[in-house]
C-alpha cells in the first residue's frame, strides 16, 4: 500500500495537479499462521506418499524420519522395505549414488524441517532404473523460497550403551533471481557394538562347535554437498552438484571358539578352546558429481527435456589382523593349532553415467522416453602378509560393466474414472574383467526387458481400485564380485563370485483405497537368481564356506492393509500390517541346499500426540512386531521393537528441540539353518537402547535489493 497523501488546494478555476507521487508503505508482519491439516498418508497412482512433517514430528534428521516411516527398514547396510527387499533412494527425483554408511551419513545431514514428503514407489515408471527389487524411495524436499538466504544448524548427541556420539550438520540455501545455491556440511562420530554367537551341530559325527563374538567400533565421518543452479530463462536451467563423504573406523572383535564331543548321554565334552582377538581399521570415501540441464516449453507446459551426467567414485581400504591360540580344556597350549593373519583389502570403483529424458504431451496424456549409459570399472585387491597362517598371498581382480538402457512410458486417462500408465525398459549389460592378469572368459553379456503396468479405477471420491505389475532387478554390489578368500577365523571363510548376475523379481498387485485412509493390497511375486550368501559346512573340519551366489528362488503371496486415523485434534495414528506366505529355496541352479516355507505376519503402529492447540509440543511412539519368517534361507525368529519421542518448537518455529529413544522394546534376533548333515543357529544382538537429543535452529531472511530498502523508497518519492 501507500502512505496517506494530503495537500491543501485553493481552486480558482481549472487546475493541473501534475504527477502525484505516493510513498510506498510496507508493514512487516511478525508471523502469519495458517491452520490446516494435510493427510499423513496418501495413495497416488504409482506411489504411497507420507507427509514428512507429521509421520515423525520428533525426528531430528531425514534418517530419523525414515526410521519411523511405516514399512521402511534402516540399517548400517542401507535402506529396504520390510518383507520386500532393497530400494534405490532418490532426493527430489534424482538418484543418490551412495550406499551403506555413506548414504546413512548423507541422510543424517538433512534436518527434518527440510523434508516435505516421503514417497514409496513399488511400481515405479520405466524412466527409473530397474534396480531396487522392492522399488524406489523418493525424498521430496521443501522448495527453496524466492529471494531468500538462510539455513539451519543442528547439533545432536546420541547415547548408545557406554558410547556418547555426536554430530553437527549445517545447511545454507540461497535463491535470488536466476541463481539457486545450497551447501551442506556435516560431521560427527558413529559407533556400533553387539554380539554374534553361532553354534554348529553335526549329528553324524557327534560334534558340536560354538563361536561367540563380541564386537565394537567407532570412528569419525564427514560429508559435504554443494549445488548450484542457474535459470537462463524461465524455461531453461542448468545446474551442478558435488558431494564428498569420507569415513574412518576402528573396531575390535573378541572371539571365543570351542570344540565339543557329543556323548551318548547328550552331554557335551569340551575338547579344545580357541580364544582369538581381531583389530580392524577401515577408511572409505564416496565422491559424486552431477551436471544437469532442464528445458520446459511455454507453449506446451507438459513438454520437457532433461540431460544428466554423473560421476561416482568409491574408495575403500580395510586392514585386519586376527590371532587365536589352541588350548586344551586345562589351558595347555596345543602345538600347531595357532592361527594368525594380517590382511589388507581395498576396492576402487569409478562410474560414469549419462542420461537423456524427453516428455511429450499427447492429448490428455503424456509420452516419456529416454536413453541412458553407465560405464563402471571396479578393482578389488586382497593381500595377506608372509606371517599369515595361510601364507603370503596377493590377488587382484578388475571388473568392467557397461549398461545401456532405452525406455518409454505412456500415461493417459481412459475416461473420467479409468487411468492407464504403462512402460517398457530395455537394458543391455556387457561385462568383462581380469583375475590376476587372466582374462575372465566366462563373463556374459545379456539383454533384459522390464515392463510396468498400472491401471486405476476411481468410481467416485470414496473408492479407488488399482492393478499394477512390474519386473525389477537387483545388481550385485561390486565388493561381492571379489572371489578371494576373506577369513573371519580359521572356521569361517567368505568369498564373492566374479560372474554374479543381477537378481530379478516380478510382482503383480491389486489394490483398494477407501476415503484415502483405509488401504488394502493383494500381491504375488517371484524372485529368481537372488543374490545371497550360500553356507556350506564341512562336518569333518567344521570349516564353513560362505559364498555370494545367484542361489535364491522365492515365491511370495501377501495381503497388506494400512489405516490412517486423525478424527480427533490431539491424536493421530497410522497402522500397517501384512500377512504373507513365502516359499524359499537356497541352492545353485536347480539344487536346494536349505530354505523353507511358511506364513509371516508383521504389524507396525506410528502414533502422534499433540499436547497443545498450536501443535508445537508433540510426542510420538512406534511399535513393530514380526512373527518368525524365512530370509536368505535362514529361519528367523520373531522381531519386536519400539520407540518414543518428544519435540517442542519455539521462537515462531525457528528453534526445535527433539528427544527420542530407539529400541525401547527390542529382542535379539535368532537364525537357524537345518540340513541332513548339520544344523546351525545364530544369535545376533545389535539392537541396543539408543537415546538421541537434537537441537535445530533455522535462520534466514528475504534478500532485499536496493529498490526495496526504505531509504531508497523515500528518495524515489522525492524524484
Can you say where each PLM-predicted feature lies in the sequence?
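Short, acidic, small-residue-rich periplasmic hinge/interaction motif at the N-terminus
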Residues: 3, 12-56, 74-76, 82-86, ...
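N-terminal periplasmic accessory domains that precede
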Residues: 18-21, 62-65, 103-106, 120, ...
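Short acidic/polar hinge/loop motifs at secondary-structure boundaries
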Residues: 62, 95-122
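Extracytoplasmic beta-strand/coil segments of soluble accessory domains associated
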Residues: 63-99
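Transmembrane beta-barrel wall of Gram-negative outer-membrane proteins
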Residues: 163-195, 206-253, 281-289, 453, ...
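Face-selective signature of the C-terminal outer-membrane beta-barrel domain
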Residues: 225-247, 278-435, 458-462, 516-522, ...
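Outer-membrane beta-barrel signature, preferentially recognizing the C-terminal barrel domain
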Residues: 345, 398-399, 473-521, 526, ...
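Gram-negative outer-membrane beta-barrel transporters
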Residues: 550-626
Amino acid at each position: 500500500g501507500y502512505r496517506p497523501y494530503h495537500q491543501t488546494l485553493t481552486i480558482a478555476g481549472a487546475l493541473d495537479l501534475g504527477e502525484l507521487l505516493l510513498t510506498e508503505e510496507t508493514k512487516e508482519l511478525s508471523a502469519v499462521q495458517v491452520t490446516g491439516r494435510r493427510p499423513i498418508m496418501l495413495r497416488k497412482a504409482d506411489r504411497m506418499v507420507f507427509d514428512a512433517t507429521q509421520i515423525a514430528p520428533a525426528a531430528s534428521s531425514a534418517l530419523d524420519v525414515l526410521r519411523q516411516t511405516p514399512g521402511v527398514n534402516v540399517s548400517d547396510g542401507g535402506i529396504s522395505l520390510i518383507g520386500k527387499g532393497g530400494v534405490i533412494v532418490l532426493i527430489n527425483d534424482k538418484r543418490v549414488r551412495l550406499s551403506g554408511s555413506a548414504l546413512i551419513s548423507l541422510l543424517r545431514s538433512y534436518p527434518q524441517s527440510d523434508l516435505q514428503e516421503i514417497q514409496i514407489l513399488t511400481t515405479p515408471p520405466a524412466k527409473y532404473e530397474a534396480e531396487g527389487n522392492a522399488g524406489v524411495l523418493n525424498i521430496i524436499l521443501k522448495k527453496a523460497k524466492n529471494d531468500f538466504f538462510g539455513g539451519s544448524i543442528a547439533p545432536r548427541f546420541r547415547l548408545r550403551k557406554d558410547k556418547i556420539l555426536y554430530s553437527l550438520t549445517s545447511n545454507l540455501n540461497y535463491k535470488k533471481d536466476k541463481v539457486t545455491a545450497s551447501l551442506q556440511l556435516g560431521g560427527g562420530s558413529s559407533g556400533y557394538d553387539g554380539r554374534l554367537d553361532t553354534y554348529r551341530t553335526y549329528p553324524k559325527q557327534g560334534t558340536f562347535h560354538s563361536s561367540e563374538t563380541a564386537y565394537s567400533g567407532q570412528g569419525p565421518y564427514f560429508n559435504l554437498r554443494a549445488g548450484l543452479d542457474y535459470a537462463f530463462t524461465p524455461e531453461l536451467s542448468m545446474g551442478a552438484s558435488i558431494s564428498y563423504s569420507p569415513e574412518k573406523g576402528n573396531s575390535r572383535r573378541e572371539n571365543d571358539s570351542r570344540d565339543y564331543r557329543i556323548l551318548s548321554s547328550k552331554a557335551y565334552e569340551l575338547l579344545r578352546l580357541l580364544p582369538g582377538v581381531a583389530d580392524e581399521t577401515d577408511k572409505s570415501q564416496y565422491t559424486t558429481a552431477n551436471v544437469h540441464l532442464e528445458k520446459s516449453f511455454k507453449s506446451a507446459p507438459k513438454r520437457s527435456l532433461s540431460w544428466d551426467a554423473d560421476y561416482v567414485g568409491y574408495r575403500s581400504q580395510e586392514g585386519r589382523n586376527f590371532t587365536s591360540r589352541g588350548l586344551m580344556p586345562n589351558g595347555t597350549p596345543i602345538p600347531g593349532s595357532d592361527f594368525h593373519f594380517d590382511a589388507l583389502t581395498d576396492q576402487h570403483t569409478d562410474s560414469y553415467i549419462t542420461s537423456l529424458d524427453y516428455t511429450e504431451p499427447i492429448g490428455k496424456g503424456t509420452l516419456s522416453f529416454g536413453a541412458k549409459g553407465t560405464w563402471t570399472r571396479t578393482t578389488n585387491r586382497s593381500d595377506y602378509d608372509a606371517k599369515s597362517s595361510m601364507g603370503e598371498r596377493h590377488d587382484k581382480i578388475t571388473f568392467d560393466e557397461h549398461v545401456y538402457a532405452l525406455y518409454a512410458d505412456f500415461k493417459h486417462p481412459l475416461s473420467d474414472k479409468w487411468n492407464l500408465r504403462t512402460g517398457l525398459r530395455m537394458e543391455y549389460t556387457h561385462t568383462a574383467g581380469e583375475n590376476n592378469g587372466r582374462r575372465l572368459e566366462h563373463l556374459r553379456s545379456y539383454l533384459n526387458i522390464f515392463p510396468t503396468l498400472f491401471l486405476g479405477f476411481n468410481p467416485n471420491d470414496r473408492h479407488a481400485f488399482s492393478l499394477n505389475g512390474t519386473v525389477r532387478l537387483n545388481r550385485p554390489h561390486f565388493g561381492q564380485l571379489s572371489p578371494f578368500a576373506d577369513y573371519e577365523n580359521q572356521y569361517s571363510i567368505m568369498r564373492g563370485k566374479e560372474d554374479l548376475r543381477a537378481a530379478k523379481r516380478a510382482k503383480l498387485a491389486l489394490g483398494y483405497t477407501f476415503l484415502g485412509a483405509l488401504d488394502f493390497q493383494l500381491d504375488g511375486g517371484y524372485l529368481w537368481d537372488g543374490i545371497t550368501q550360500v553356507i556350506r559346512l564341512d562336518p569333518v573340519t567344521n570349516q564353513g564356506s560362505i559364498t555370494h551366489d545367484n542361489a535364491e528362488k522365492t515365491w511370495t503371496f501377501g495381503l497388506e492393509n494400512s489405516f490412517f486415523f486423525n478424527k480427533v485434534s490431539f491424536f493421530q495414528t497410522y497402522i500397517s500390517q501384512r500377512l504373507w506366505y513365502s516359499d524359499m529355496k537356497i541352492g545353485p541352479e536347480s539344487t536346494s541346499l536349505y530354505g523353507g516355507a511358511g506364513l509371516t505376519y508383521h504389524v507396525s503402529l506410528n502414533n502422534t500426540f499433540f499436547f497443545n492447540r498450536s501443535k508445537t509440543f508433540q510426542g510420538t511412539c512406534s511399535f513393530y512386531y514380526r512373527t518368525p519368517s524365512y530370509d536368505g534361507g535362514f529361519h528367523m525368529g520373531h522381531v519386536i521393537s519400539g520407540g518414543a519421542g518428544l519435540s517442542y518448537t519455539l521462537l515462531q518455529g525457528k528453534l526445535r528441540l527433539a528427544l527420542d529413544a530407539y529400541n525401547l522394546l527390542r529382542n535379539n534376533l535368532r537364525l537357524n539353518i537345518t540340513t541332513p548333515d548339520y544344523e546351525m543357529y545364530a544369535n545376533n544382538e545389535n539392537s541396543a537402547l539408543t537415546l538421541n537429543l537434537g537441537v535445530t535452529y533455522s535462520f534466514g531472511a528475504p534478500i532485499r535489493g536496493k529498490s526495496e530498502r526504505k531509504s531508497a523508497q523515500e528518495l524515489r518519492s522525492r524524484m
